[in-house]
From Swiss-Prot:
Active site feature: 9, 140
A Pfam family the protein falls into: GHMP_kinases_N
Lineage: Bacteria, Pseudomonadati, Pseudomonadota, Gammaproteobacteria, Enterobacterales
Listed pathway(s): Isoprenoid biosynthesis; isopentenyl diphosphate biosynthesis via DXP pathway; isopentenyl diphosphate from 1-deoxy-D-xylulose 5-phosphate: step 3/6
Residues the entry annotates as binding ATP: 98-108
Keywords: ATP-binding, Isoprene biosynthesis, Kinase, Nucleotide-binding, Transferase
NCBIfam families: ispE (TIGR00154)
GO biological process, one term: isopentenyl diphosphate biosynthetic process, methylerythritol 4-phosphate pathway
Complex formation: Homodimer.
Catalyzed reactions: 4-CDP-2-C-methyl-D-erythritol + ATP = 4-CDP-2-C-methyl-D-erythritol 2-phosphate + ADP + H(+)
Protein name (database record): 4-diphosphocytidyl-2-C-methyl-D-erythritol kinase
GO MF terms, alphabetically ordered: 4-(cytidine 5'-diphospho)-2-C-methyl-D-erythritol kinase activity; ATP binding
Class of the enzyme per the UniProt entry, highest EC level: transferase
Length: 282
């Protein structure tokens, strides 16, 4: 039995630069990981069975990203004669990341399954192959597979490794879940932010094109951001619902968390450029 980290991510900035004919939005964003997240426990099996021991209420196992990722790896490795006979697993997840929070929980779980099972089964797929598989599961999965902070373009799959400052963050959950399509389908969402170079963006004040829509449609997000902004620079991550404030020290972040109103759930974590999953493989 082995335990594998499935870390959260933050979008330190997020700009929507266009919309493709297939409906997907093109963007420019900066991904950084947190030293905080879910934990997957994986017990390899030799009878070919795949079991999720911690099902999610209302989500059939075969639709769960964890199971879908495992099946996808099984199929890809089998088709290239790299799946040892009888490969299977019992998988359980200790969830700390909220669904619909903008922290990448489901995508991170999928990436951890791909990376961990490839290692435990000895399939020998490359990082590039795993990232390509991950993209079939979601646009955010490849960055978790690669495990390095990155500037992302396209629909989020064109990644350039970067080294943003590793600050401390107070991440707050306003108590609502925001499905990504709710934000991306909003007619008022900016969809024509000019594309800029990495260097230009890294030297500008960071912001998120989705933030205004999230604040307008969800008063809880507005209230959380209004409270955080009293203490530090704060933004929405992804399409929400989580918001974060940045600090130079852990103690400063914890001091603010200690004064948080009862309706605001939060945690303090450090931004890291090498993900805990990547570190687990070193």
């Amino acid at each position: 039995m082995s335990r594998w980290p499935s870390p959260a991510k933050l979008n330190l900035f997020l700009y929507i630069t266009g919309q493709r004919a297939d409906g997907y939005h093109t963007l420019q964003t900066l991904f950084q990981f947190l030293d905080y997240g879910d934990t997957l426990t994986i017990e390899p099996r030799t009878d070919g069975q795949l079991r999720l021991l911690t099902p999610v209420a209302g989500v059939p196992d075969e639709e769960n990203l964890i199971v879908r990722a495992a099946r996808l790896l099984m199929r890809a490795a089998s088709e290239s004669d790299r799946l040892p006979a009888g490969s299977g697993a019992d998988i359980s997840v200790d969830k700390r990341l909220p669904m619909g929070g903008g922290l990448g929980g489901g995508s991170s779980n999928a990436a951890t399954v791909l990376v961990a099972l490839n290692h435990l089964w000895g399939c020998g797929l490359s990082e590039e192959e795993l990232a390509t598989l991950g993209l079939q599961l979601g646009a955010d999965v490849p960055v978790f597979v690669r495990g390095h902070a990155a500037f992302a373009e396209g629909v989020g799959e064109i990644l350039t490794p970067v080294e943003p400052e590793e600050k401390w963050y107070l991440v707050a959950h306003p108590g609502v879940s925001i499905p990504t399509p709710v934000i991306f389908r909003d007619p008022e969402l900016p969809r024509n932010t000019p594309r800029r170079s990495i260097n230009t963006l890294l030297n500008c004040e960071f912001s998120n094109d989705c933030e205004l829509i999230a604040r307008k449609r969800f008063r809880e997000v507005d209230a959380a951001l209004s409270w955080l902004l009293e203490y530090a620079p704060s933004r929405l991550t992804g399409t929400g619902a989580c918001v974060f404030a940045e600090f130079n020290t852990e103690s400063a972040a914890r001091q603010v968390l200690d004064t948080a109103p009862a309706w605001l759930n939060g945690f303090v974590a450090r931004g890291v450029n090498l993900s805990p999953l990547k570190q687990a493989l070193l």
